[in-house]
Amino acid sequence: MTNYAANLQSVRAAAQRLAGLAHRTPVMTCATLDRLAGRELFFKCENFQKVGAFKFRGACNAVFRLAAEVAARGVVTHSSGNHAQALALAAKMRGIP
């Protein structure tokens, strides 16, 4: 059997860590697109998230999971886009220089 890192317990723990940090973004629908697709579609509007992308959730979860002694050493990423912006904001929110 395959062992996945994500399970219900880890998802709930991440949700607790993100409470008050990440925006609760809306889920929207569009009747026109539903008709065209022949089914009901839902759109999670992560463009309303901090830094304008879903990447903030993962970066924030990772930064706030770090032990204090690890966080004190700082964080680094190889990105020039949404992930870099998300990590920088999450680190700032945690007080990591």
What is the meaning of each model-derived region?
Residues 1-97:
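PLP-dependent amino-acid enzyme catalytic core
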